Amino acid sequence: LTITSFAEFGLAAPLTAALERAGFHTPTPIQAQAIRPQLEGRDILGLAQTGTGKTAAFGLPILHQILALPGRPAPKTCRALILAPTRELAVQIEDHLRRFAGGARITTALVLGGVSRNAQIRQLSRGVDIVIATPGRLTDLVGDRHLRLDEARWVVLDEADRMLDMGFIREVRKLVGALHPRRQSALFSATMPPEVAGLAESLLSNPVRVEVAPRGETIDRIGQSVELVATAEKRGRLAAILSTPEASRVIVFARTKRGADRVAENLAKDGIVAEAIHGNKAQNARNRALDAFRSGRVRVLVATDIAARGIDVTGISHVINYDLPDEAESYVHRIGRTGRNGAGGQAITLCAPDERQKLRAVEKLTRQRLAPGGDAPRPAQREPAFHAEAGEGAKRGGGPRSNAPGGRRRRARRFAAA
């Protein structure tokens, strides 16, 4: 049967009341498919992109079942463990769980790197219902015996493919091995490379498979375009795009941490206020940058792929790929930052001649050719070369020149965001 209302799940009263207060009535597709089996005790293998409502899909069943338990967790234990690849995503998950709980007697603890261990150790010493953690810091605290996982009956691995990309799979396997053998597990991933499939096989028992966005599927309401520009011309082209009134809230993606800093510095020189966010930034600096972006004090955020996981900001008008990603799947994650909650959005890719192979990988994954964009003149013969197969090649130096002048320039919410 198709689920059309959260009321059909029979969730605990505090959860239902919190959803009603927030105006959340209709589950997203992944919530409609995943919540009921988990309430029945089944494991879940979820294939879904970011922004589809995954947090509620695994969070509501855990909260519902914990509320039915008597007593409190024992010291240095937790009842549920949620692993996330990045600090930003972990913070976002905890925030959503608190909202869903609606003031019910649920305790949570964030276990993250980049901040003091002492406060985390004190909180864990009392015992908590739900630990939301990144693998590195959690491995340290478990190894130092500040937390036992053998009483955790629920475990969630969110964005498992990104954990693989970040080299966390070994730590994740070790942590999973310390969990209670009779546990309920869920694994969510946007893609399913062999290593993640192997992890799912060892973690899950006869799981229900739910799939919302098949691999390579992108959101139709996002306008996607590509501009072939020389590397040296990217700075001017980016400034020109950001000078348009339509570019009201923008995420610019750079491939490396150093590259993100360089882009933000160049934008500042061009009179455009921007903040950079990446893994080398301290947690409080990352939080300040995100707060400034959410509040509108800063309208341009420059990010790396890993740091962008967990950015939960509505109203993104543009995503700009200053650099093409090394992995085509990251393109799908990037552009998914815009076009959320029924709104439209634009995704613009600036492609240098030496990035053509990465562009072809993106087009193969998404099964579509990106439309040529930009208002600069572009010779008609350049387009076939631009999309040519590797053996055909493309003329060196082809592509548009930015017509942006030099000098300084002044440049309805739904539950699916959970």
Predicted regions and their residues:
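Conserved helicase RecA-like core
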Residues: 1-382
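Arginine-glycine-rich low-complexity intrinsically disordered regions
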Residues: 117, 380-418
